[in-house]
Amino acid sequence: MTTPLYWQTEGEGSDLVLIHGWGMNGAVWQTTSEKLSQHYRVHTVDLSGYGHSAELGCADFDEMVKQVLAQAPKKAAWLGWSLGGLIATKAALTSPERVSQLITVASSPRFSAEKGWRGIKPLVLSQFTEQLKTDFTLTVERFMALQAMGSPNAKQDIKLVKKAVFSRPMPDQQALATGLMILADIDLREAVSQLSMPVCRMYGRLDGLVPIKVAHDMDELMPNSAKIVFEQASHAPFISHNDEFISELRTFLNQHA
């Protein structure tokens, strides 16, 4: 039997799963889940190799998706931030009967930039991979700074993310390396048109990792999905614009309940 992932569940109501991004853990949702738990039964997970699931070590992309599905509620709305958006999207594609609504935050079906598609330059991803080998704590901190870049409250945002992440065990080094490979290699662009449940895509207009051009390109790939852009936010709108984020999320979930 596989060792279970670490989950936190709070609140009552319809089920909502929250999935963190690369280098992070479920504590990053603390303020968000406290507020959402007044309306929903909120489930936050530490992915394999992260936070309280760090000792489980590394898992590849498909295995990560299976691990979350194995312990998630039978049917729930799934919300994934950044790398977590890829995992939530893949879960919705492989097990659509389990995902009632899909929400992606500062995410993309293809994170790596290529001709005709905006994203993270492959060189940046390979530099992070190299830095991991020498100082993975510093690498995670640099990624946090990159996430907040552009936000008017960048310093405060980084402080909040750091506090959350460092409140739990540091991620497994190999899990971090595998996560960067996922960001570099996974491409779900052709698959997303198959999604049948209501989908909401949330973006920060100032995001340096998922450029706003991606939001417009996704309008063509997913014409039936909802799109929300937080004008003054960067890569973590649920941290920099928490009340606005929760209001938009609740509106979408209520419309598609």
From Swiss-Prot:
Binding residue positions for substrate: W22, S82, L83, F143, M144, A145, L146, Q147, H235
Residue ranges of the TM segments: none
Location, primary (coarse class): cytoplasm
Pfam families the UniProt entry points to: Abhydrolase_1
Cellular compartments per GO CC: cytoplasm
Function: The physiological role of BioH is to remove the methyl group introduced by BioC when the pimeloyl moiety is complete. It allows to synthesize pimeloyl-ACP via the fatty acid synthetic pathway through the hydrolysis of the ester bonds of pimeloyl-ACP esters.
Protein name per its UniProtKB record: Pimeloyl-[acyl-carrier protein] methyl ester esterase
Gene, per the UniProt record: bioH
